[in-house]
């Protein structure tokens, strides 16, 4: 019986990290011949999203990374890079968020809600099958608060 308890405890400790490791590459092609590539990766403790959009004579790369908990991704860094130069960024600490266009300088606000960029929000929804009831979205340039209404 003691061996069974030890094996069961080991299995329970292993399962949450075993199912959580994912590495997806997605290619999107439109009628406008502008391919986009998105790479989603999560290993149980960290996640990253890297999106590349190839517009003729103009390349855009969105990157996001952060930690991973049992119920949500926690973004710590987001960058919008255009033609190899940083355009907009968001930096998240436990108590503040800095964001803005690089050329205009960054604004700092208290961090009051979970924060996602659009790609991390999509990854959160597909990976965990839910979003927090209130959160905020950033594109690096600004922040928009979101409140979800739940049906009763």
Question: What are the residue ranges of the model-derived segments?
Answer:
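Short secondary-structure boundary micro-motifs
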Residues: 2, 22-25, 48-51, 73-74, ...
